[in-house]
């Protein structure tokens, strides 16, 4: 009787007990390729993948003959899923927390030169023990000169992206560096369709550096790939460091700051539409609103994709002449930025918290939000 698993194994790692006819796998020969498991029609062989391998949607992680994990940089899109899923802490994102502490000290707590913190809108759903205003106060106590919403950068981006979409007729978003990297590495024919706009983080960082040349800028958010983004030639001059929400919490803890007992600081730069960038669908809503506010006669037909599997399907459809959409909103994480690998919480109500945060915006339109740019000091 033929055994499919034995034939599937190219390493001759599978043999059979002549008495019981049960399969025996020689671990000295097995390389955990999983071909035997796929070939067995009885599911007698189970292939338990490492959490990091299972989490990686672009198949960038493999193991060598010594069972050490390897990351293929030619495939990796810096989504951070492996970091989040590894239960052993074996994979870590590079931290700039020491560099930020040194920069704050060197600036004499923003007295010699101002250090701006740009906070991602997903922060509104993260710190359950304190209000957002109290968290903003905590950030200032760490030594930052000012705290600004990345959502304001989102307002700026959506305004320009709406114009670009109407001119080109088809566009993919550029806000998520993981999505942009995914296109460049897997769908080169679509690279020309990526929006030319910088991300909200970089757009706002650029503005801050232009009005305050000696300023330093630190982005704080849920994202690992932002740490790679700031190395890009188009971005490196605008954002100095990236911290995750986890690293922000570590800094707050290191100073024994009890945010829940602090007075609230105001954070009211952005519009509702800029703030909802934090969840899937928010970017598309903002582009629609921007077209409306600028009186541009163009109907946006968005395809909203969250998570790399959905992004893959969307990009495959984009190459079809029968596509029925003209804009792809791509986010590397499920549910958008609120599903980021360095979020402090991944709860169903996070989307509700972001929408609530959006509804509290003082600036009701994108145009109003852009109009407050001059007030950033």
Name each model feature, range by range:
Residues 2-24, 35-72, 77, 81-97, ...:
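Iron-sulfur cluster-binding cysteine motifs and their immediate structural context
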Residues 26-28:
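Nuclease-adjacent, charged terminal/linker segments that flank catalytic cores
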Residues 87, 92-377:
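Iron-sulfur-associated redox domains of electron-transfer enzymes in respiratory
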């Amino acid at each position: 009787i033929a055994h499919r698993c034995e034939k599937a194994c190219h390493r001759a790692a599978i043999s059979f007990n002549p008495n019981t006819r049960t399969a025996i796998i020689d671990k000295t020969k097995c390389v955990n390729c999983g071909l035997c498991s796929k070939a067995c029609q009885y599911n007698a062989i189970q292939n338990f993948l490492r959490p990091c391998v299972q989490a990686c949607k672009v198949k960038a992680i493999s193991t060598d003959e010594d069972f050490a994990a390897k990351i293929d940089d030619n495939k990796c899109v810096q989504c951070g899923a492996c970091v989040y899923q590894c239960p052993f802490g074996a994979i870590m994102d590079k931290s700039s927390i020491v560099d930020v502490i040194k920069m704050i000290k060197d600036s004499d707590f923003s007295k010699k030169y101002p250090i701006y913190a740009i906070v991602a809108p997903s922060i509104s759903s993260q710190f359950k023990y304190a209000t957002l205003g109290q968290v903003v106060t905590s950030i200032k106590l760490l030594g930052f000169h000012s705290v600004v919403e990345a959502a304001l950068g989102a307002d700026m981006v959506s305004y320009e992206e709406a114009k670009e979409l109407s001119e080109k007729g088809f566009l993919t978003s550029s806000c998520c560096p993981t999505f942009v990297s995914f296109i460049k590495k897997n769908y080169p024919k679509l690279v020309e369709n990526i929006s030319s706009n910088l991300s909200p983080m970089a757009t706002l960082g650029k503005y801050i550096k232009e009005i305050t040349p000696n300023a330093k800028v630190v982005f704080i958010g849920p994202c690992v790939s932002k740490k790679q983004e700031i190395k890009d030639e188009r971005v490196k001059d605008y954002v100095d460091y990236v911290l995750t929400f986890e690293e922000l919490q570590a800094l707050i803890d290191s100073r024994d700051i009890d945010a829940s007992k602090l007075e609230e600081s105001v954070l009211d730069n952005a519009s509702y539409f800029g703030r909802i960038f934090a969840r899937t669908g928010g970017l598309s809503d903002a582009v629609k609103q921007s077209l409306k506010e600028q009186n541009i006669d163009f109907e946006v037909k968005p395809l909203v994709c969250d998570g790399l599997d959905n992004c893959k399907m969307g990009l495959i459809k984009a190459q079809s002449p029968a596509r029925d959409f003209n804009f792809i909103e791509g986010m590397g994480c499920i549910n958008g930025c609120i599903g980021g690998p360095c979020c402090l919480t991944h709860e169903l109500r996070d989307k509700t918290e972001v929408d609530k945060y959006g509804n509290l915006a003082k600036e009701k339109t994108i145009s109003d939000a852009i109009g407050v740019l001059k007030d950033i000091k």
